Curated annotation (Swiss-Prot):
Cellular compartment(s): Cytoplasm
Species: Thermoplasma acidophilum (strain ATCC 25905 / DSM 1728 / JCM 9062 / NBRC 15155 / AMRC-C165)
E.C. number: 3.6.5.4
Ribonucleoprotein keyword on record: yes
Bilayer-crossing regions: none
Protein name as annotated: Signal recognition particle 54 kDa protein
Disulfide bridges in this chain: none
Keywords: Cytoplasm, GTP-binding, Hydrolase, Nucleotide-binding, Ribonucleoprotein, RNA-binding, Signal recognition particle
């Protein structure tokens, strides 16, 4: 998960608040100190940390909760709103034909991000073309060409051309029928006049619709000065922060960049080409705090290619007890795509579920491995057995295990867990209040936030 330790600490603070019997001055001071420690550990600027916690304390002690809202929930709302202020404004990613110019220093993930952008726009129905305009790093051509093939994007490059302006103009002409043209420009090991002069020349000659700067999240609060230097020198329209999954300093990078008032368009959340996320401060913060993000939850389901009709049919089967192993197999197959289960877990409102614990990446990986094994086991079953698992006897368990290359205990565990799931669904079916609550929350699209008076 992005900012895993940061998120875990924030969620623990939320649980501490919601688990308190009352909120007094001592509790507010204690929560303030917790927040200061968490934010400083994430490399957020000291001045920013003090501003956030001072305002949080003032509001928690002076403001009265709206009618019908518990003081504990109102304090969570205050924390949400104060943290939101340091994350900047929502980006405005345009889903239309355009030319995008990527700039930034070496090692920040600029070339990889070019491929991720192409994959992102392809999902939105816009084909892309990648232009290799880094005329100084020899390996950049081959790297971008390989990435273009991986994401099924068109590619243009010319290793013999050393003038980036001529190269890009020719590339744009070659890719004129492509909706989104993405230019991977040269970087440097450090900011210098030569780099800025080259980027200015390209920008003036090409007039791109977007100039997006790529920044490494591991820089923490130092990302702010770097973004400011680029913006002052060439004028950037947006920021993409990479490697958010591999550092504890991502919070510092986000808050520092937000201070220069250049919108953050995307964040890189992993190594896969699909691991690029439009940055929406509200959704991002909601997940960090464990308040849930049903919009991302629905997007994940869409990414798994599950239609609304299929989802409704599966839900009805669950509620009526008609859900069988074949239905389970179909759902698991949809979610077998790398990274989907992780996205699903990140979107759940875990901090608002009593007794819930942090789900780290190792547990998610273990669950994915288990589901993969279960699918192999089900591949060794007959259609009749998938439709009616109750007919599977001890002799068949032995043959299924042998055919799947697993232990008999693994087959029994699958059948046991399936039976337990059906029993749980039967119990929920009889609880009208619980069923109504779940249906209402899923319709609202604000599970977790609505109870706090926070509107999307």
């Amino acid at each position: 998960m992005v900012l895993e330790s940061f998120s875990a600490s924030l969620r623990e603070t939320i649980r501490k608040i919601t688990g308190s019997s009352y909120i007094d001055k001592e509790t507010v001071k204690e929560i303030s100190k917790d927040l200061q420690r968490i934010l400083l550990k994430a490399d957020v600027n000291v001045k920013t940390v003090l501003q956030v916690t001072k305002e949080m304390e003032r509001r928690a002690l002076e403001e009265k909760p709206p009618a019908g809202m518990a003081h504990q929930d109102y304090m969570v709302r205050i924390i949400y709103e104060e943290l939101l202020k340091i994350l900047g404004e929502p980006s405005n990613v345009k889903l239309k034909p355009q030319t995008i110019m990527l700039v930034g220093l070496y090692g920040n993930g600029k070339t990889t991000t070019a491929g991720k952008l192409a994959r992102f726009f392809a999902k939105k129905g816009l084909n892309s073309g990648l232009i290799a305009a880094d005329v100084h790093r020899y390996a950049a051509y081959d790297q971008l060409k390989q990435i273009a093939s991986e994401v099924n994007a068109k590619f243009y490059g010319d290793q013999s051309e050393k003038d980036p302006v001529r190269l890009i103009k020719h590339g744009l002409e070659q890719l004129k029928d492509v909706a989104v043209k993405i230019i991977d420009t040269s970087g440097r090991d450090s900011m210098d006049a030569e780099l800025f002069d080259e980027i200015r020349r390209i920008k003036e000659a090409v007039a791109p619709d977007e100039v997006l700067m790529i920044i490494d999240a591991t820089m923490g609060q130092q990302a702010g000065p770097e973004a400011k230097a680029f913006n002052d020198a060439i004028g950037v329209t947006g920021i993409i922060i990479t490697k958010m999954d591999g550092t504890a300093k991502g919070g510092g990078a986000l808050s520092a960049v937000a201070e220069i008032h250049v919108p953050i368009y995307f964040i890189g959340t992993g190594e896969h080409m699909d691991d690029l996320e439009v940055f929406d401060p509200k959704k991002f913060l909601s997940r960090l705090l464990g308040l849930g993000d049903l919009e991302s939850l629905f997007e994940t389901v869409q990414e798994a290619d599950i239609t609304e009709e299929e989802a409704q049919e599966s839900f009805e089967k669950l509620m009526t007890g008609k859900f069988n192993l074949k239905d389970m197999y179909d759902v698991w197959e949809k979610f077998s795509k790398p990274g989907l289960m992780k996205k699903l877990v990140d979107a759940l409102p875990l901090a608002r579920i009593p007794g819930s614990q942090k789900i780290d990446d190792s547990k998610i990986q273990s669950a994915e491995d288990k589901l993969r094994m279960y699918r192999i086991i089900m591949d060794s079953m007959t259609f009749e057995e998938l439709e009616n698992p109750e007919i599977i006897n001890a002799k068949r368990i032995t043959r299924i295990a042998r055919g799947a290359g697993v232990r008999e205990e693994d087959v029994r565990m699958l059948l046991k867990e399936f039976k337990a799931m059906k029993n749980n669904m039967k119990m929920m079916k009889g609880n009208r209040g619980l069923k109504k609550m779940l249906q209402a929350n899923f319709r609202s699209g604000n599970f977790g936030l609505e109870d706090l008076g926070i509107k999307e």
